[in-house]
From Swiss-Prot:
InterPro entries the UniProt entry points to: PS_antenna-like, PS_II_antenna-like_sf, PSII_PsbC, PSII_PsbC_sf
Pfam families, sorted: PSII
Keywords: Acetylation, Chlorophyll, Chloroplast, Chromophore, Manganese, Membrane, Metal-binding, Phosphoprotein, Photosynthesis, Photosystem II, Plastid, Thylakoid, Transmembrane, Transmembrane helix
UniProt protein name: Photosystem II CP43 reaction center protein
One Gene Ontology cellular component annotation held by this UniProt entry: chloroplast thylakoid membrane
Subcellular location, record wording: Plastid, Chloroplast thylakoid membrane
GO BP terms: photosynthetic electron transport in photosystem II
Source organism of the structure: Jasminum nudiflorum (Winter jasmine)
Length: 473
């Protein structure tokens, strides 16, 4: 098979487990990798690697479509989404599909359409994956040079990076267009308990949007996770989309500078490690977002955040005892602090009791009762609306606590229910995946650096014990 470049020249970049230099075939003898090493067998077979990636995309999209339809089939409109263990429908509802005031589901047909579209797309991707894995050319360099590449070709690699950045930027703008022109998105802060609305007054001020990045990650600061209005979220996507698209064009048109050529390792395994590191960071950030943010992840669909459930409990009992005649402004608790209300370290009026630690919670059902100095006593006495009482009672009993056996609630609660918040699942899964992706990043970065330096520590695959054992079949 004709190749356009010397294999010997580039092969040291990948850490192969034996010295074989032939690229034909996908078995251990010809690639140095056994079948279980997966795509490592395809390092120099760009056509087959394309097939593996397209097929993988097909599996992902198939899961999305099938799980989407599964959730639609099991969905009970009378119960909140977070009580039904749903993780996909809340995302569709947040985008404004099928929901009305208060987050009430009015139409499940858009969810059905989403599932079917993903299934159809997965069939197309699956066919493409099978075609390129089994029938298409092994390498793309000869027949389709635009799609071919050599891992060490720095200019080609940054061009591919640029194309990816442009696609990410277009993805960010899809959300912007949905929010501005195509029906709007769900705003949990809309008056009266949330509604779908078009975003009309985008925040584009760089001082506001990039100010989030400069905030402390702790307490009431909360870094970017503290964003609490949709104008900022959609405006942020305008900025990010623009930066990604402009950066993509830049990377397509330019070649890497000398310092970048020297500083970075230029091999397939190095790019894998960079990607895993980025995905790890995304996973950890997503974990914090779904844990604490009730604007991007509205509580109507995902259930309350931990602080929100705690504050809801204090609010619920304040309402109850006030009706029973308690003077909530002056009643003392067992420690001598206020039983229902007290002051924060900075002087605001906040809920008393154990929930004082969550005093900087902001939630749409609570904010109308605040004044310039925290909770307003006169509003608490006169202005509490029935929807606020209903919502806080609901959130109080649905804290995002839970265990692997799906018995939710506080660990010491004897009346525990079979409920685990989607917030718990999404936060935990993204934390665990973020951690494992970070380990993968370290592993592949170490191998890529070792290969670039011309040495590798590891098992000699030519004399591995398993090679002398009888095959399983």
């Amino acid at each position: 098979m004709k190749t356009l470049y010397s294999l010997r020249r580039f092969y040291h970049v990948e850490t192969l487990f034996n010295g074989t230099l032939a690229v034909t075939g996908r078995d251990q003898e010809t690639t140095g990798f056994a079948w279980w090493a997966g795509n490592a067998r395809l390092i120099n077979l760009s056509g087959k690697l394309l097939g593996a990636h397209v097929a993988h995309a097909g599996l992902i999209v198939f899961w999305a479509g099938a799980m989407n339809l599964f959730e639609v089939a099991h969905f009970v409109p009378e119960k909140p989404m977070y009580e039904q263990g749903l993780i996909l429908l809340p995302h569709l509802a947040t985008l404004g599909w099928g929901v009305g005031p208060g987050g009430e589901v009015t139409d499940t047909f858009p969810y059905f359409v989403s599932g079917v579209l993903h299934l159809i797309s997965s069939a197309v991707l699956g066919f493409g994956g099978i075609y390129h894995a089994l029938l298409g050319p092994e390498t793309l360099e000869e027949s389709f040079p635009f799609f071919g590449y050599v891992w060490k070709d720095r200019n080609k690699m940054t061009t591919i990076l640029g194309i990816h950045l442009i696609l990410l930027g277009l993805g960010a703008f899809l959300l912007v267009f949905k929010a501005l022109y195509f029906g709007g998105v769900y705003d949990t802060w809309a008056p009266g308990g949330g509604d779908v609305r078009k975003i009309t007054n985008l925040t584009l001020s760089p001082s506001i949007l990039f100010g989030y990045l400069l905030k402390s990650p702790f307490g009431g600061e909360g870094w970017i996770v503290s964003v609490d209005d949709l104008e900022d979220i959609i405006g942020g996507h305008v900025w990010l989309g623009s930066i990604c698209i402009l950066g993509g064009i830049w990377h397509i048109l330019t070649k890497p500078f000398a310092w970048a050529r020297r500083a970075l390792v230029w091999s397939g395994e190095a790019y894998l490690s960079y990607s895993l590191g980025a995905l790890s960071a995304f996973g950890f950030i997503a974990c914090c977002f779904v844990c604490f943010n009730n604007t991007a992840y509205p509580s109507e669909f995902y259930g309350p955040t931990g602080p929100e459930a705690s504050q809801a409990q204090a609010f619920t009992f304040l309402v109850r005892d006030q009706r029973l005649g308690a003077n909530v402004g002056s009643a003392q608790g067992p420690t001598g602090l206020g039983k229902y209300l007290m002051r924060s370290p900075t002087g605001e009026v906040i809920f008393g009791g154990e929930t004082m630690r969550f005093w900087d919670l902001r939630a749409p059902w609570l904010e109308p009762l605040r004044g310039p100095n925290g909770l307003d006593l006169s509003r608490l006495k006169k202005d509490i609306q029935p929807w606020q009482e209903r919502r806080s009672a609901e959130y109080m009993t649905h804290a995002p606590l839970g265990s692997l056996n799906s018995v939710g609630g506080v660990a010491t609660e004897i009346n525990a229910v079979n409920y685990v918040s989607p917030r718990s699942w999404l936060a935990t899964s993204h934390f665990v995946l973020g951690f494992f992706f970070f380990v993968g990043h370290l592993w592949h970065a170490g191998r890529a650096r070792a290969a670039a330096a011309g040495f590798e520590k590891g098992i000699d695959r030519d004399f591995e014990p398993v090679l002398s054992m009888t095959p399983l079949n």
